[in-house]
């Protein structure tokens, strides 16, 4: 009997998923980063009006130009000069990450990923034929990776590094000096930088420091 591809069989359920399966029906879940509020009324109305106007057809490959332009403007504080040509709309953050790994990782090539980490980072790298190497983000360093740990893990097969600030799941953030050190490490080893900043607006002290 034929079986699934090796890359599919290599993907195992995460610890988070196992805990969900063990939970009873009356359990209060703290396991998902899901807001307890609805989208703003202006957004709901805009989606509603778009459906009434028949705007539910195929768009350009990169996404609606007006949406891409708005996103570029929203990032102007972090990366001045962005235009809609620098933005590509995807179905989700995970879909965007898969696209990046498909673009950057040849079979056998490695990406450095943070640990603790969002559960789909590693499986996404595996599914495209790449390999994940995990660098530690320790409590005693406020979950910010240390350059000496990164230096011990990088090798000639490593082509990219993923940074995640604010971090999921630790909540760790970085300051400007730490950002500059992490950028310099990547430049030194000629690594692609993948920056997951999906929680950039959930900051309780200070301001978000972007790697853009």
Name each region found by the language model:
Residues 1-7:
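Generic N-terminal amphipathic, Lys/Arg-enriched alpha-helix
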Residues 7-92, 99:
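N-terminal small-domain helix-loop-helix segment of the aminotransferase-like
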Residues 8, 32, 114, 171, ...:
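Glycine- and other small-residue-rich loops at beta-strand/loop junctions that grip anionic moieties
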Residues 24-27, 129, 157-158, 190:
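Residue-level detector of structured alpha->beta connecting loops
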Residues 55-184, 201-212:
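Conserved core of the PLP fold type I
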Residues 191-192, 203:
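Metal-dependent active-site segment of extracytoplasmic phospho-/sulfohydrolases and closely related
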């Amino acid at each position: 009997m034929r079986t699934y591809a090796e890359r599919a069989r290599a993907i195992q359920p995460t610890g988070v998923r196992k805990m969900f399966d063990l939970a009873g029906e009356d359990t209060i879940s703290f396991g998902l980063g899901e807001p307890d509020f609805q989208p703003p009324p202006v957004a709901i109305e805009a989606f509603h009006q778009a459906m009434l106007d028949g705007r539910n057809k195929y768009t350009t490959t990169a996404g609606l130009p007006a949406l891409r332009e708005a996103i570029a403007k929203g990032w102007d504080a972090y990366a001045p000069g962005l235009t809609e040509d620098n933005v590509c709309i995807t179905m989700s953050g995970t879909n965007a990450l898969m696209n990046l790994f498909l673009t950057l990782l040849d079979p056998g090539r490695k990406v450095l990923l943070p640990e603790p980490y969002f559960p789909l980072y590693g499986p996404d790298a595996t599914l495209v034929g790449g390999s994940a190497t995990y660098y530690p983000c320790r409590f005693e360093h406020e979950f910010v990776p240390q350059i000496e740990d990164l230096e011990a893990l990088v090798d000639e097969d490593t082509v990219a590094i993923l940074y995640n600030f604010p971090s999921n799941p630790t909540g760790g953030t970085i300051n400007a000096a730490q950002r500059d050190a992490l950028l310099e490490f990547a430049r030194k080893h000629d690594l692609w930088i993948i920056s997951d900043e999906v929680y950039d607006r959930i900051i309780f002290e200070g301001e978000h420091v972007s790697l853009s």
